């Protein structure tokens, strides 16, 4: 099954008349991962569902299919819509479990585990501070199963918070969303002014296509085909042994989507072994504002290209524009010289990016009255 990414906001810091702040949905074979949920997220989510119903018959984004909410960091343009959305799902009597994940600092983890106040050095935008505040504002009264897990990504150290007490217990590792058997969610450390990480959804390698032509040549029955397709060997009545591996091509390579969140260009932890099929990377500033990008640990479009090369991405999509960037085309124009063969697209609100099993990427551009598809040839 393909990975279908819905980008519901491409503005940075605050909404504009044409752009909302961050919030994306990544739909894969196991369910939906929500990456960030800025101001007004639940309204934008509901509108996208209505768009699908009207313009993409048969495609859905059911809230009951959301298994995980993962924050890239704690700045409010990435988090401020989360608690209202969670409370709305509770009012709608949600029963499905939800995993909530986010990065924090070692100092915050230590304080939570020791049941002591957070140190002054822990910034207001740290997710540890926010979550404790959310618990006091009703987050501790949600009635559906929910796990609150914070981690020091660089140290791979994770704790689960108790919303009733504010305490926590250490975990052996970062948990995966419940029911995910065909995909994995992974944090990728980034470089920002508060604890941060990107999130990568990777679909596992899948079996190659079933060789129908060979099955036709052998005159196999429907039952025999089904057995071989399931990986079961068959002993035929004439004594012939048919091995399932003879009817499958080689495994298809895993495909993946990495959403960076806010970050400076080329985080030190990024390595080309990560190799996402698609990187969705922030592009907050214009090239002329490089000093400002460095100061606030953000990126330009050209910086995003450098990040894509550092992490071994096959395709790059830009998002998270400052209000000085009136058109996403501006970002693309500024980075066209340095892209040098890397497939790139500039996103707008409500666009979709579909990563197929074989690694092709389609940019579905929202026009206001449906989506138009642009095929992107991966750089592989």
Residues covered by each model-derived region:
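Glycine-rich S-adenosyl-L-methionine
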Residues: 295-311
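Conserved active-site loop/cleft motifs that coordinate metal ions or position small ligands
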Residues: 278-281, 316-320, 343-348
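A conserved acidic, glycine/proline-rich C-terminal tail/linker
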Residues: 318, 322-328
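Mobile, glycine- and charge-enriched loop segments
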Residues: 263-297
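Binuclear metal-dependent hydrolase catalytic cores
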Residues: 1-258, 266, 271, 326-380
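Conserved acidic residues
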Residues: 67, 277, 314
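Active-site flanking residues adjacent to catalytic metal/cofactor-binding acidic residues
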Residues: 35, 72, 261, 281-282, ...
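Active-site-proximal loop/turn and secondary-structure-junction residues that shape catalytic pockets
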Residues: 285, 322-323, 350
